């Protein structure tokens, strides 16, 4: 179980399932994609379902507002300094906002890292991250995708679960409908988890990017309407799994928040089942 090899992890979990220990591993049978409406998402309990695919600007706006507001306030105070200091210091402080915008244009990654760090100040930050990543972990486990690692660290939030066979299919652009459906459900699990708990989803951008990458690597190619339906269906399926396994999801959230190992997280899933 400690091997960083997806085939070895999968084989070990299959054996544990056979002897009755890993009962939740790969326990969710395949369900083929179907037409799904926004009303079904709302009925499930997803809040503001019509806005799920719209990237949130909450963290970005709050960060930029804080930078501009703080520098503006400090600039006014600095203007009270005597002599030339009252001119040069406000000028230097005022330039901070321009520097931030310039960094965002030249190196967006640095700005996003700063915004990510700032986001941790929100009261719901830790719960959102744990809820989001635990959803990816749990849904992948239920669908039989081996988890090799995860992180809740700022700027590094992820669950590493793609196995070698699927990686080859993705890189070669040969994902079939069945595998695309399965991966789509895992990709949308974090978004679904947030949508079930909060009025607005914040961490959907990376999930939607992942889903689009998978769609682009699949055959046959999907039309825009089919892509939209796949997204809705995947959110519905993932949300249903999370609602039906709410206690397990919360137990996994707790374990991941304590930086438990992958094996300890799996134990948390099975004990809560």
Describe the predicted segments one by one.
Residues 1-68, 73-273:
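Soluble catalytic regions of large protease machineries
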């Amino acid at each position: 179980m400690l091997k960083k090899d997806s085939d070895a992890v999968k084989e070990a979990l299959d054996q544990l399932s056979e002897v009755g220990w890993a009962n939740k591993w790969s326990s969710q049978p395949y369900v083929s994609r179907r037409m799904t409406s926004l009303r079904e998402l709302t009925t499930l309990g997803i809040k503001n379902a019509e806005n799920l695919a719209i990237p949130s600007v909450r963290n970005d706006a709050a960060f930029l507002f804080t930078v501009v507001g703080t520098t503006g306030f400090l600039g006014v105070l600095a203007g009270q300094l005597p002599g030339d200091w009252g001119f040069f210091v406000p000028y230097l402080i005022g330039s901070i906002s321009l520097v931030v915008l310039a960094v965002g244009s030249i190196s967006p990654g640095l700005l996003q890292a700063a915004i990510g760090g700032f986001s941790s100040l929100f009261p719901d930050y830790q719960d959102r991250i744990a809820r989001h990543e635990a959803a990816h972990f749990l849904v992948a486990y239920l669908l039989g995708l081996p988890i090799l690692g995860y992180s809740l660290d700022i700027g590094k939030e992820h669950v590493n679960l793609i196995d070698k066979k699927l990686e080859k299919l993705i890189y070669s652009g040969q994902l079939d409908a069945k595998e695309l459906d399965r991966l789509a459900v895992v990709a949308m699990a974090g978004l679904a988890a947030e949508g079930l708990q909060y009025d607005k989803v914040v961490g959907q951008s990376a999930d939607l990017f992942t889903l689009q990458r998978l769609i682009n690597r699949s055959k046959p190619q999907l039309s825009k309407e089919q892509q939209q339906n796949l997204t809705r269906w995947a959110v519905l399926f993932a949300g249903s799994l999370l609602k039906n396994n709410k206690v397990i999801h919360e137990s996994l959230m707790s374990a991941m928040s304590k930086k438990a190992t992958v094996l300890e997280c799996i134990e948390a899933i099975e004990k809560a089942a």
